[in-house]
Amino acid sequence: MYDINPIYNDVRLYFNEAEHKYTDTFNNQYISTTTLLHEYAPKFDKKYWLKKKSAELGISEKRLAQQWQDITEEACARGTKIHNGLEDGIKTTSMFYDAIQHIPRNDNTMTTVADINTIDQYIKPIVLDEFIKFTENKYPKVYEIFDYYITNGYKIYSEIGVFLPNLLISGTIDILILREDRYLIGDWKTNRGGLKFEAGYYKKDRTQKPNQLTDVWVPKKDVLLPPVNHLPNCNGSIYNLQLSVYAFMVETILGIPNAGLWLCHIDSDFVLNEYGMPKRFPDGLYHVKKNPIEKVTLFKMKYLKKEVMNILSDRRKVIAATRIQSQSLFD
């Protein structure tokens, strides 16, 4: 049994999929961890870049905006398909779907780490052979990781919620590897360009139409916003902070220490250009090969607890100001 923080005794988290909104038992609205952290990244001036890039490419802003939207939608669909395959494999082979039937819930109730004592007795260690079969033997490196932790007495949870009721922050952990004395957190990423841990960009070959990415990396002196302005402005920094916020939430709920954080990048095996980079086709999109072989790269991450505490201090001030403002409306 886990010693669940008593602040979770009377509060549950709900997710309205149609409105994409998180609330709790008391109808408080939550901000997702992802949304919160993107407030610390310099804002992308879409209007400016549409005007600049459309002029460079000789196409209308409307057409370029649609190409950007198509790329985003394709990436989301591809990422969701990979995430769902891994999630279903874990939940099916660990009896998770049966276990959550023991939680009093309505249709919008999220299963969270605060429910661990209710469901843990019904969760079984993943049957690795079944998981490998379920995921079509595509991720040998993932199987090695899971085998190690299963052998050492851990249970593996997928897509499980976490939240901080006092700060109205929520999130969903891709992979929670849990034992009664410690835990680890993992996350799947499917970015076309991979993970970067420094600010910068790849130079483009503008002699081709459409322009093609080259393998020449151009570093930039670009950082996140205070109080994390010592971190480079790149997806690796945001993802590291995301995992670290989740780790703090799990510690808050269960009171046990973190034993590790990792990001697992799954490359979809795109058609490559002459520079070895994903090729952009005349339709403006990047195409996956007909018979793709997905490649897994694992990144061990630091627990940025100090940075998390600074971000949560900011959030605490926002919550306090909101409550003061709300009270003044009724004074």
Regions found by a protein language model. Give the residues of each.
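Short, solvent-exposed loop/turn segments at secondary-structure junctions
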Residues: 163, 190-193, 268-269
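A generic structural motif
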Residues: 161-163, 176-178, 264
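Conserved catalytic cores of phosphodiester-cleaving nucleases, focusing on short active-site segments
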Residues: 83, 173-197, 212-214, 220-224, ...
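Short coil/turn segments at secondary-structure junctions
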Residues: 66-69, 73, 226-234
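Low-complexity, serine/threonine/proline-enriched polar segments
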Residues: 111, 115-131, 208-218, 223, ...
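Nuclease catalytic cores
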Residues: 1-170
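Metal-dependent nuclease catalytic regions and adjoining charged, substrate-binding loops involved
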Residues: 216-226, 232-240, 244-331
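Gram-negative outer-membrane beta-barrel domains
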Residues: 165-166, 170, 198-206, 223-230
